[in-house]
Amino acid sequence: MSKKAEPIVIGKFGAVHGIKGWLKVHSYTDDPESIFEYKPLLMKSKGQFQEVNIADWKRHSNGFVAKIVGFDVREEAQALVGLELLVDSDKLPNLEEDFYWRDLIGCQVKTDNGYDLGVVTEIMETGSNDVLVVKANSNDAFGQKERLIPFIDKQVISNVDITSKLIQVNWEPDF
């Protein structure tokens, strides 16, 4: 991977489960079980990254619970509730003809007609589709400071070129 590896959030700890220190785990990965395959798994506590050693995990209801090494009672595990689970970005699989949402941050966005709409600063998750937040250029002819562009493949998003950091959209610049 060309970028320096940086920790990427792939899940978080939920509520404590039982009295022996088990925790609910919310996975953000495409295949939810794959969160347990990443090594090392990290958590950020008090501004510091620490390795998470999972002794065991199992399916529970619609999710998972995990037993973390060194957290043997409910009260100890309570300190982990809400902490994010991360993995170094270089541990993520390379995508041949696809990309991660994080790869879109910093991409230039242009209309199919070549108008420069600005740069992607973040991606918002909505119920129906994700939305690109595009910071407009300071000299935007339409006076826009920011644009919200739905990420709808083929209908709004014409092309994504991660190598060139360019997203081409079917979008009116004055909208």
Curated annotation (Swiss-Prot):
Its main location: cytoplasm. It comes from the Bacteria. It holds the Pfam family RimM. GO terms for molecular function: ribosome binding. Residues 96-175 form the PRC barrel domain. Coiled coil: none annotated. The keyword rRNA processing applies. GO terms for biological process: ribosomal small subunit biogenesis; rRNA processing. It is found in: Cytoplasm. Keywords: Chaperone, Cytoplasm, Ribosome biogenesis, rRNA processing. One of its GO terms (cellular component) is ribosome. An accessory protein needed during the final step in the assembly of 30S ribosomal subunit, possibly for assembly of the head region. Essential for efficient processing of 16S rRNA. May be needed both before and after RbfA during the maturation of 16S rRNA. It has affinity for free ribosomal 30S subunits but not for 70S ribosomes. The PRC barrel domain binds ribosomal protein uS19. Belongs to the RimM family. Binds ribosomal protein uS19. This is Ribosome maturation factor RimM. The lineage of its organism: Bacteria, Pseudomonadati, Pseudomonadota, Gammaproteobacteria, Alteromonadales.
